Amino acid sequence: MAVAIPNCGTYTVEMDYGASTNAFVLDSVTAGVLDSTDYFLEGTTDWQDVTAYVKQVSINRGRQNRFRDPTGQPSTAVIQIEDRDFRFSLVNEGSPYWNTAKGRLGFELNSGVRISRNGTYLFTGIITQYSQQIENPNRSLVTVNCSDALFTLNNSKTTYFTATPERSDTRIDTVLSNAGAFNKPGQRILETGVANLGNAPVDETASVLEYILRVNNSEQGRVWVDGSGNFNFDRRLVGELQDIDVTLSDTGGTAIPYTTFDIVSN
C-alpha cells in the first residue's frame, strides 16, 4: 500500500511480476483465438504494490553537465527492499510473486517498474539488474536497478530505409514506428520540429537512440522519456536570441524599478 511521508506526499512503488490473466497463448483453445476481445498479445500488466517492503528509493534523471550535447542517458531508479520473509527471493517457490508458469520469480530483467507520488508518476521503466544479499537466516536485502525506455532504444538497431525529406519530428516518428517502439496511443509526444531533413538513406549500423540523437542534434532540441514512460521531443527554442527591450525606471509605472546603478567601461 502507498506510504505517506510527512511534508513530502504519498508514494507508491509498483512492480510487474509477469502474471497475466488475459495474455494471448499460442495454440490455446480459449486464449489463442485471433481477434479475441478477451485475450491480447501482451496481456494486461499485473502491477503489484510493493511499497510496504521498500527501504529506500532513488531516481536520477537529466544531464549531469548542461553544457554538453545530449547523450541519451536514460533515467534510472534504484529500489532497495527489506525482505525479511524472503518473498522477493530468487529461489523461494512459496513466494506470492512466484510465476508458476515460468517456474521462477516473477520479478526479473525487463519486468516493468513504476514509482508515483500523489498519483503522478515520477518514473516508469524496466528492471535492468536484480540482486539479493542474504545477511542472516532471517534477513535479506534486495536491490533492484531500473532504467527507462531509452535503455531499450539504445539496444535496438534501426531498419534500412531511404527517408523522404521531412521535418525532424516526422523523422523521429518514422524511426520509432519502424522499431516498434512507443506504439501505444499517447506514448509519443512530439512537438513540430523546425529543422528540415533530407532524403539520406538510414542504415542498420546505428542504434535507434543513436539515430534519434543525430536528428535531435540537427534540431538542437530535447528528447527524453517522462515519468509516465512516454517519449517526448521538444523542438529548438525559437526566438531566444531576438532583441528584447527592457525599461528601467525609478519613477514607478510599468518599468522595472531600481535604486542604484553603475556604469563600467573596460
Label every PLM stretch briefly.
Residues F182-T192, N217-N232:
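Short, well-structured beta-strand/strand-turn elements
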Residues D262-N266:
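Charged, gly/pro-rich, cysteine-poor intrinsically disordered low-complexity regions
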Residues E191-P201:
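Surface-exposed aromatic
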Residues M1-E166, T170, T174, N199-Q220, ...:
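Assembly/oligomerization scaffold segments
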